[in-house]
UniProtKB/Swiss-Prot annotation:
<feature type="region of interest" description="Disordered">
    <location>
        <begin position="1"/>
        <end position="34"/>
    </location>
</feature>
<dbReference type="GO" id="GO:0003735">
    <property type="term" value="F:structural constituent of ribosome"/>
</dbReference>
<dbReference type="InterPro" id="IPR005484">
    <property type="entry name" value="Ribosomal_uL18_bac/euk"/>
</dbReference>
<comment type="similarity">
    <text>Belongs to the universal ribosomal protein uL18 family.</text>
</comment>
<protein>
    <recommendedName>
        <fullName>Large ribosomal subunit protein uL18</fullName>
    </recommendedName>
</protein>
<dbReference type="GO" id="GO:0006412">
    <property type="term" value="P:translation"/>
</dbReference>
<feature type="compositionally biased region" description="Basic residues">
    <location>
        <begin position="11"/>
        <end position="29"/>
    </location>
</feature>
<keyword id="KW-0699">rRNA-binding</keyword>
<keyword id="KW-0687">Ribonucleoprotein</keyword>
<comment type="subunit">
    <text>Part of the 50S ribosomal subunit; part of the 5S rRNA/L5/L18/L25 subcomplex. Contacts the 5S and 23S rRNAs.</text>
</comment>
<dbReference type="GO" id="GO:0022625">
    <property type="term" value="C:cytosolic large ribosomal subunit"/>
</dbReference>
<dbReference type="GO" id="GO:0008097">
    <property type="term" value="F:5S rRNA binding"/>
</dbReference>
<keyword id="KW-0689">Ribosomal protein</keyword>
<dbReference type="Pfam" id="PF00861">
    <property type="entry name" value="Ribosomal_L18p"/>
</dbReference>
<feature type="compositionally biased region" description="Polar residues">
    <location>
        <begin position="1"/>
        <end position="10"/>
    </location>
</feature>
<dbReference type="InterPro" id="IPR004389">
    <property type="entry name" value="Ribosomal_uL18_bac-type"/>
</dbReference>
<comment type="function">
    <text>This is one of the proteins that bind and probably mediate the attachment of the 5S RNA into the large ribosomal subunit, where it forms part of the central protuberance.</text>
</comment>
C-alpha cells in the first residue's frame, strides 16, 4: 500500500488516526466477485462510493455527490450521502451485485458514512 504513516509535523493528528484505521481495516477487508467491496471516499464537501472486485481490480458501480443526478438535490450533506447510497445500490443491483463488504476507508462509522450505508441497505444491498 502506498500510505505513509511517517511522523511529518505538518500532518494533522486526525489525518494520522484516519490513515492508521485505514491500514488496519484494509488488512481485513477484501472484495470477491460474489461480495465486492463498497469503498467510501469522503471529503469536506463531497462523498463518493465505488463497488470494487479486488480479484480482478475492476469497479462494478459507482456514485458521487458530484454527479449531475445529485447536483440539483437540495438537502444537507448527510441527506445527499444517503441519496448516494441509494443510487449506488440501484447501480450495483443492475450490475448483478446483491451483497457487499463495507469498507469505510478509515472514516468513523458516523454521520455521512453511516447515512450512506443506511441508504445502500434501503436500496437493497446486504452487508
Amino acid at each position: 500500500m502506498a500510505i505513509s504513516l511517517s511522523n511529518n509535523k505538518h500532518t494533522a493528528a486526525r489525518t494520522k488516526s484516519r490513515l492508521r484505521r485505514q491500514v488496519r481495516g484494509r488488512k481485513r477487508v477484501s472484495g470477491t466477485p460474489e461480495r465486492p467491496r463498497l469503498v467510501v471516499t469522503r471529503s469536506s464537501k463531497h462523498i463518493s462510493v465505488q463497488v470494487v472486485d479486488d480479484l480482478v481490480g475492476k469497479t462494478l458501480a459507482s456514485a458521487s455527490t458530484m454527479e449531475a443526478d445529485l447536483r440539483g438535490f437540495s438537502g444537507d450533506k448527510t441527506a445527499k450521502a444517503k441519496k448516494v447510497g441509494e443510487l449506488v445500490a440501484e447501480r450495483a443491483k443492475s450490475a448483478g451485485v446483491e451483497g457487499v463488504v463495507f469498507d469505510r476507508a478509515g472514516n468513523k462509522y458516523h454521520g455521512r458514512v453511516a447515512a450512506l450505508a443506511e441508504g445502500a441497505r434501503e436500496g437493497g444491498l446486504t452487508f
